């Protein structure tokens, strides 16, 4: 049957652009016009659309800004139709350490991925989630929602998946990642290696060529 002949190939990321390297956080923050005092960095990157769940991240940030003594800054890279609504929610929640960065070029995203301590993807729906894979390629663990394509490449060795509407679970998973993020550099190395060995664009191209060869033979 046709169903038995279907082959699903995951997207690959560009390993020439996204790879692990130490980044000077103070210099990065200076280029963003933000002060840096050694805070832990929570990062989101993506379109500011309803299905991306950035409103969930803002409410979760409100929790960890109030509930923990750990200094945490939340950076939101991207733009979209929800920007004004999210800015209003940001003001309503009184978030003091959460910042909208607007759209960022790929080289700036690379710096952000390498500087951050955890990447958060609270999507309500997510076909695949390439930005999460790019973050992992830089060694960044992911806390994401158990939706769409994210479970295809995120497991407990490289991150945490929770229900998209469980803000308590998101907050707990983020704080758990931050508790160990700077004490275990080998974790970042493992995350980057996992991404490179399983999802690099070069592997995707090779697999696709193999598929075409098998069809044409």
Can you name each region flagged by the protein language model?
Residues 36-52, 58-61:
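Conserved donor-binding/catalytic core segment of Leloir-type glycosyltransferases
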Residues 156, 160-167, 176-182:
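Conserved acidic donor-binding segment of nucleotide-sugar-dependent glycosyltransferases
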Residues 183-198, 210:
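A short, well-ordered alpha-helix in the C-terminal region of glycosyltransferases
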Residues 124:
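Aromatic "clamp/platform" in nucleotide-sugar-dependent glycosyltransferases that forms part
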Residues 103-104, 111-116:
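Short alpha-helical donor nucleotide-sugar binding micro-motif in glycosyltransferases
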Residues 141-144:
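Short hydrophobic beta-strand element within catalytic cores of glycosyltransferases
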Residues 87-104:
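Nucleotide-activated donor-binding/catalytic signature segment of Leloir-type glycosyltransferases, i.e.
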Residues 12:
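Carbohydrate-associated surface elements
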